[in-house]
């Protein structure tokens, strides 16, 4: 518990002082002075903080990470399961091509030091996660899918939308995947991570984060469905493959 608490305090200071202040005094001015390099600057910033977060977790909390497989240095669609608050830096660290747009819950648009401003800066699509998409949400997802189709961005999506209590893969919320798969003919990869079900929330991380062993497997590439009529069957296949991979991780 002590090491977990120490990491949490250090990381909160990092979010507030390093990430948050750095965005104000370094990243925003750099984008203002060189707007044509916005994507490259945001990509470098996201990747730096993702890797730094994982290094801090290893050094201060003894977290171990074992990864099998990798993602290509090109625009792609990455479908990842959702177990903990560490999923996003973990997913970002694996994407080596154009930085990924991440469909994000609207409540995270503001209120989280460092992270909320960065999500806005990176132009992530914000969603209410209701059954029916509002018009602005549909427009933002469509725009994100079109950027992926052009090869300007990747997409990192957590289609469960919520973390389950036992870390198993829940039902997929399909709107984001349907739109992306229908508009972006890019290779699809699945990332399955396990070992984080006990740190679902920041409160869990405060007392139980230390000595976590995270295991990750990358599946794919998968070719996109040939037409819109096959999109739902393709999503079902991804869910089945990811569930089987998680079961295999837990048996090994």
Annotate the PLM regions.
Residues 142-146, 155, 160-165:
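Soluble extracytoplasmic domains of inner/organellar membrane proteins
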């Amino acid at each position: 518990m002590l090491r977990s608490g120490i990491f949490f305090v250090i990381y909160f200071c990092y979010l507030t002082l390093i990430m948050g202040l750095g965005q104000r005094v370094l990243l925003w001015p750099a984008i203002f002075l060189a707007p044509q390099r916005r994507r490259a600057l945001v990509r470098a910033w996201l990747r730096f903080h993702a890797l730094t977060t994982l290094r801090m977790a290893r050094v201060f909390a003894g977290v171990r990470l074992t990864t099998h497989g990798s993602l290509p240095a090109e625009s792609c669609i990455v479908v990842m399961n959702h177990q903990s608050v560490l999923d996003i830096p973990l997913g970002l660290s694996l994407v080596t091509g154009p930085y990924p747009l991440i469909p994000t819950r609207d409540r995270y648009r503001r209120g989280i030091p460092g992270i909320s401003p960065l999500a806005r800066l990176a132009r992530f699509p914000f969603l209410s996660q209701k059954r029916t998409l509002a018009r602005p949400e549909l427009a933002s997802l469509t725009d994100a899918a079109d950027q992926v189709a052009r090869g300007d961005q990747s997409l990192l999506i957590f289609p469960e939308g919520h973390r389950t209590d036992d870390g198993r893969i829940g039902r997929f919320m399909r709107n984001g995947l349907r739109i992306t798969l229908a508009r972006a003919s890019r290779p699809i990869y699945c990332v399955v991570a396990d070992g984080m079900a006990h740190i679902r929330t920041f409160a869990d991380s405060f007392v139980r984060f230390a000595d976590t062993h995270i295991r990750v497997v990358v599946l794919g590439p998968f070719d996109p469905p040939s037409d819109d009529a096959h999109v739902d069957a393709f999503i079902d296949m991804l869910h089945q493959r990811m569930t089987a991979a998680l079961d295999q991780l837990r048996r090994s």
